[in-house]
């Protein structure tokens, strides 16, 4: 990983949590708040920054403290995106983005990004795919209903 690479992956025991691995060094002498600010600076390249920054400040402290005490050189912290109970068989993440709730089914392959922009692109693509799926399902239901009309009913075509 290069210095600004970020890996986002789901936790294997808690699919409603995301782990973000970053190569930003966290020496034990560095104050936690300073490290959080440094990390948020990385996130500022994306429209997701405000949402992520909020999550980081809420859940960052305890995890970062453990890292500092153990003098790890790589930061590993957890951000919880879950807003509702999640079935264990699904790795489903719900994100609040632009006042919408987006459900993501993440692959087991980590998302690597020199820029958080590619994560945003991934999310938007997933959203478009979901919208296409919903449109196709609605269309298919409509066609199914029209095929099942009784002979006496008038066709809409």
UniProtKB/Swiss-Prot annotation:
Tree of life domain: Bacteria
The protein, known as: Putative ankyrin repeat protein B
Annotated organism of origin: Escherichia coli (strain K12)
């Amino acid at each position: 990983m290069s210095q600004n690479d970020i890996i986002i992956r789901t936790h294997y025991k808690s699919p409603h949590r995301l782990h973000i691995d970053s190569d930003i060094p966290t020496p034990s002498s560095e104050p936690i708040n300073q490290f959080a600010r440094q990390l948020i600076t990385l996130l500022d390249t994306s429209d997701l920054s405000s949402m992520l920054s909020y999550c980081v400040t809420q859940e960052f402290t305890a995890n970062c403290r453990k890292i500092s005490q153990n003098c790890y050189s790589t930061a590993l912290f957890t951000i919880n995106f879950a807003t509702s109970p999640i079935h264990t068989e699904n790795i489903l993440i719900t994100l609040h983005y632009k006042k919408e709730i987006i459900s993501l089914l993440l692959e087991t392959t980590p998302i690597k990004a020199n820029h958080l922009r590619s994560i945003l692109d991934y999310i938007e693509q997933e959203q478009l795919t979901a919208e296409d799926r919903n449109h196709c399902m609605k269309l298919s239901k409509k066609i199914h209903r029209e095929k099942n009309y009784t002979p006496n009913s008038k066709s809409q075509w």
